[in-house]
Amino acid sequence: MDLQNKKMTEDAFFAQRKEVLATWHTGKDLSLEDGIAYQKTITGDKRFGEKLQKAAAERQTLTQPRAGVALPEEHIKLLRFLETEGEADLLPSTIDSYTRLNRYAEGDVGIEKSKETGRSMLNGFPAVNYGVEICRHVTSSVKNPVQVRHGTPDARLLTEITLAGGFTSFEGGAISYNIPYSKNHALEHTMTHWQYTDRLVGMYQEAGVSINREPFGPLTGTLVPPCISNAVAVIEALMAAEQGVRDITVGYGQCGNLIQDVAAMRSLRILARRYLDRFGFKDVKLTTVFHQWMGGFPQDEARAFGVISWGAAAAVLAKSTKVICKSPHEAMGIPTMEANAQGLRASKQVTSMLKDQDMTENPLVVIESDIIEQEVECILKKVEELGKGDFAVGAVHGFAAGAIDVPFAPSRVNMGKAMPARDNEGAIRFIEVGNLPFTDDLKKFHREKLEERAKTENRPVNFQMIIDDVYAIGKGFLVGRPEGTK
């Protein structure tokens, strides 16, 4: 394995860059110097990281949607609507699925079909197909900072074009945009691809341009125990920092139990800072993002607003720097811009109401946070051991050994032995720990928590609990109880 968690040399980077820029015609004449020069013209109020840092200092929680359509003018119209009618503090450009798979020719077909039909035939904005100038038109046409949000195992060309195009934040990571999204991508390959992305961001940083980087916290978004997502976030933060990234936002997807959600965010902040400092990255600016519920939603819009508001409440009580907002159309598919704006306003109402409240030092939160820390430390110590001190190599071996195991992930790399279920209060525990390197005390803790639920429901701890929990929120509950349970 050639993989190492070491900063790419300039020779290695620029040799690879020639190949990357040649993969689609919009990369052909792309100039790194021009991209840096253009980024330097973007004022502080349009810089993603600066707005996050200000919010963190003021202990505010900013709102951000997901959004993206095929045609530039329609995309601009959508973003403008979300920042005016939706009152979004931060804006996205969600990238289409063809771009995520580097199938740019099919993206071109989608653009043409969108023009013919008068509606978006792509599920996002095809930034690579359009190239730098149109990206600059998009980012300069709105008032707020814009982030690239996608799901791309190999995002090298996308990074090149969007950074030169004026986007000031880039989401994703080698693990979080592989394991939950892809079946066949080798982890060592996505590791090297994302080292390129992070090294490019590092080069902008070294030239005086700070680009925010955000690993994708929720992973599969389905009953992911906090220790798994937190461990992945720390590894991806370390890998980004090694390549020169100095502005990182670590994230987490809502599980639904308020104590556990606040504790997860608390422990994530502590652990990310601890590991960055330990490896000499004390100059990395660290912020957080909380994703509202990523699982099944109720079809009824009024009930969906309840789920959205609960996510906003958890985010602000955990003092997350920003919250990624859902819409009341979540159960139906891609929302209208009006529905997207409604989800944003509902979230804004809650974050504004609760902005002066802080649950992070609540005694129950601290206890749960300590448990999550212990679990994450078990995983990270094993990863470090497997990699002989190298977290990139260790992550590859860690997945192979099941020391990191993401529930319900499609990837062949993922062992899939660790299985989650909710305890009697709705916190996510492990019904099967698989090969996770937990202590006996931690294994006992999870077993006892689930046995407590089983006693309440008068049934054994079994796989049916998992199935019931997956569908519960869509049916109006957090814990998937059998009918007749009091």
Protein language model annotation of sequence segments:
Residues E188, Q205-E338:
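Long alpha-helical, hydrophobic tracts
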Residues M1-Q243, D247-G251, N257, L442, ...:
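Catalytic alpha/beta active-site cores
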Residues E83-E87, V138-V142, L163-G166, F170, ...:
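Structural signal for hydrophobic packing residues in well-ordered secondary-structure cores
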Residues H75, L79, G124-G131, A155, ...:
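Generic structural signal for well-ordered, non-membrane alpha-helical segments
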Residues D89-L90, G208-S210, R278-L286, V323, ...:
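Flexible, glycine/charged-enriched surface loops at secondary-structure junctions
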Residues R103-K113, H185-W194, M265-R269, A331-T360:
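C-terminal helical cap(s) of enzyme catalytic domains, especially alpha/beta-barrels
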Residues D2-G27, R47-L52, A339-K486:
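Catalytic-core signal marking the mid-to-C-terminal active-site face
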